[in-house]
């Protein structure tokens, strides 16, 4: 009986070793495939972006060189709008690829939050194409946050622009934040009075290329990039299911004491 048990153990050991080798090989193949995918995405994005930049540039020249009433200007505007949309898609695809591969750079520094958010609201209001009111609702006293200002701006402007797509003229979009010292995080919220998000779609909106409305322009990657970036920064993002007056996106961002980062 002891001999049979020993033999069985040896066979089991061989199977485990074979399985370990297979798993290692599979892991190496997956990593190689992921590297090839990232290289392909990067190369293709570069190859597509170069001619698109030329199209955008020449369409701008066309717009500025013809009379506003001319039919040609309308066509030039269409070319420029759709070219910019394609450039945004390329940029978004590259961001997703870099986030997944851990190659997107983050540069942390102390940032005065109220001023930073006010600048985002000003930028959004300047570029918006609807008459919805975009406003800031947060404490007026300065607050220093240790963050990557550029990535934080990308997240918030993505959320504000997303809200603008679904908020009619006369509606409002509000950016707010609260500090939760107990959980050592800051909670940002972007609240709109738009069409809202059906409950069965709320978990899907953070998936890549998921669009609530196929007739609304966009790449379908903005919210996916927000989620990946926020998670990379140590936070999370979700939809407030209790808010019924439109849509409310909330995301968390870790906070640090200033002394702890300066040591």
Predicted regions and their residues:
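Primarily the dimerization/phosphotransfer
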Residues: 18-64
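Short conserved segment of the HATPase_c
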Residues: 57, 197-209
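Short alpha-helical segment of the dimerization/phosphotransfer core of two-component systems
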Residues: 81-86
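Helix-loop junction within the histidine kinase core
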Residues: 97-108
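Short conserved segments within the C-terminal catalytic ATPase subdomain
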Residues: 127-136
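Short alpha-helical Gxxx[C/S/T] motif in the catalytic ATP-binding
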Residues: 222, 226
